[in-house]
Amino acid sequence: MDEDGLPLMGSGIDLTKVPAIQQKRTVAFLNQFVVHTVQFLNRFSAVCEEKLADLSLRIQQIETTLNILDAKLSSIPGLEDVTVEVSPLNVTAVTNGSHSETTSEQTQQNSTQDSGAQESEAPSENVLTVAKDPRYARYLKMVQVGVPVMAIRDKMISEGLDPELLEKPDAPVPNGESERAVEESSDSDSSFSD
């Protein structure tokens, strides 16, 4: 023992003389812990379930709104003949921010060269462009009207179309799709003639 009367080694208690822990008290503590843990987990699962239900409802509302918008746009007569020119300068300015000036000058030079090349190719071949294709024209019209591009991309993917062609309205329609579009347009023309 030191000068204060405290033991130098160990607790100084003879463990053989200490009474046993009361089992009822241990069981009560354990039961209280289990009850509180289960209540916490129940509250947590209820909150998670409520948030998931709210999110599911919002997704259904957005899907319904998108379907209504799609129906409204498809009911507009003459929408198939609309051609839309998307300016690459606007897209570059939005995506690159501070580098927009130098990039826009480069894209302007590239687009001038590309348009010159396309003008020389266009008369030599009768190519169906994205802007003239009725399947893509309605999506280009949606972009012009101001529908969010991500929603249009999702809709195009669901219909099996390439959403990258929204940015290139003067590009030729991919091979398989142009033949299908010509067949569909000829089928629709023949159905009107009957």
UniProtKB/Swiss-Prot annotation:
Gene Ontology, cellular component aspect: early endosome membrane; WASH complex
Modified residues annotated as N-acetylmethionine in this record: 1
Keyword presence, Mitochondrion: no
Location of the protein in the cell: Early endosome
Keyword Acetylation appears in the UniProt entry: yes
InterPro entries: WASHC3
Coiled coil region boundaries: 46-74
Pfam family, one: CCDC53
First-listed, main subcellular location of the protein, grouped into a coarse class: other
Keyword annotations: Acetylation, Coiled coil, Endosome, Protein transport, Transport
Superkingdom, taxonomy of origin: Eukaryota
Region (Disordered), start-end ranges: 94-126, 158-194
Signal peptide feature range: none
Compositional bias per record (Polar residues), positions renumbered to this chain: 114-126
Protein family per UniProt: Belongs to the CCDC53 family.
Free-text function comment from the UniProt entry: Acts as a component of the WASH core complex that functions as a nucleation-promoting factor (NPF) at the surface of endosomes, where it recruits and activates the Arp2/3 complex to induce actin polymerization, playing a key role in the fission of tubules that serve as transport intermediates during endosome sortingg.
UniProt name for this protein: WASH complex subunit 3
